[in-house]
Amino acid sequence: MLTAQITVEIQGDTHPEAVEAALQGVREAGGTLGRVRAPRLTVNMPASVAAEPVTSAQTVIVPHSVRAGFRGEYRGSVVVLGDVNPGAELIAAGDVIVAGALRGVVHAGYGGTHPDPIVWARPIASAQIRIGDAVARAPEGSSNMRRTDRTERAERAYLQDGMIVIDVQ
């Protein structure tokens, strides 16, 4: 007997009667419909691409979240299509853009060659961010343990008069 909300995944074109039959089966088992969505897609990066060194100041796209222990150095900017979890570190000569929550340590503008580097994430919940030579630390207990809600607005960190400023987008 189901006692929880159920997520139904539908792949491709599906006949409405098939959807109704699935919903009826969930109801008959005592469950309730939580949501209907397409299946989640996992994108695996080929080992040859992951090991390929970046030789120019290009933007690198990381197609997944990064976990604790990951350390990435980039000659240009980096875009992470996921979260940067606590214990992960990103160092970029350019900008650091995170499509999800930023809880790891980042350094944008490393080396001082990129004009006006930024850190952008939804939200910035990191214990420490660095932009150029400036360092910002979160107050004790307010950083990566903060619960993040997917509805949180994006935040942008940038340098202003040599200090890191974070504003809500």
UniProtKB/Swiss-Prot annotation:
Belongs to the MinC family. One of its GO terms (biological process) is cell morphogenesis. PANTHER family: SEPTUM SITE-DETERMINING PROTEIN MINC. InterPro entries: CAP/MinC_C, MinC, MinC_C_sf, Septum_form_inhib_MinC_C. Cell division inhibitor that blocks the formation of polar Z ring septums. Rapidly oscillates between the poles of the cell to destabilize FtsZ filaments that have formed before they mature into polar Z rings. Prevents FtsZ polymerization. Keywords: Cell cycle, Cell division, Septation. Interacts with MinD and FtsZ. This is Probable septum site-determining protein MinC. The keyword Cell division applies. The keyword NADP does not apply. Pfam families: MinC_C (PF03775).
